[in-house]
Amino acid sequence: MRRELFPTLPHDVVILGNFNQLYKIEPTTFRSWLRILAQLPKSILWLLRFPELGELNLRRTAKAWAGAEVANRIIFTDVAPKSQHISRARVCDLFLDTPECNAHTTAADVLWSSTPLLTLPRYPYKMCSRMAASILRGALPKTTEGRQMATELIAGSEVEYEQRAVQLAGGLSYSMTDSGYGEGYGRLAEMRKLLWDGKWDCGLFDTRRWVDDVETAYEEAWRRWVAGESGDICL
């Protein structure tokens, strides 16, 4: 699928990506991404035309802030149908989250594809800035490996966010197999395997548990209404 999406891309290029609507990319985040690209000459940033008008503005801004070489390594594709969107998310090597307003459903889609997601809860008091960290923790196994991976992918500051991105992406390498496909090596490849192995048992994708919890909450809400009781219902 990588060849279908990016037929001219060399096999050793690392694909950084974000599939959010473009309004979530505010200036501070975009500057961070440009600095990350500048430190990773064998990388691209994959964004969506979401909306199409945003592409021209971001390209113009990238050229003004970081120069033509970096700006030319930002690649836009059209928004895909849902099934294709989830499938092709695995082509991305590292998803760079938007700290101001995180990926929500998109984060779950990306993690289902087993693509590592780097996030920064920029504002502890804003739920939309903490969401991806919570989703990520829900996708990871409750093991030492899972907890370690969470500490690596949940940054504590802008500087740490950029450093982690450069470290993880810079440590990824590919070698071509006899069948003509690239095989990844490095910490990002290890993270992808952990996400793949863990998603069948993790809480985030345990649909049966979600349904059971919601049904229990509905029953409890009805019971409280009949009894004239109030209060939060915790799932």
Annotate the PLM regions.
Residues 1-81:
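Conserved catalytic-core segment of nucleotide-activated headgroup transferases in glycan assembly
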Residues 12, 20-22, 48-50, 57-60, ...:
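C-terminal amphipathic helix plus adjacent low-complexity
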Residues 28, 156, 209:
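Residue-level signal for the nucleotide or nucleotide-sugar donor/cofactor binding architecture
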Residues 83-85, 105-106:
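Short acidic active-site motifs
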Residues 90, 94, 98-204:
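Catalytic binding pocket for nucleotide-activated donors in carbohydrate/polymer assembly enzymes
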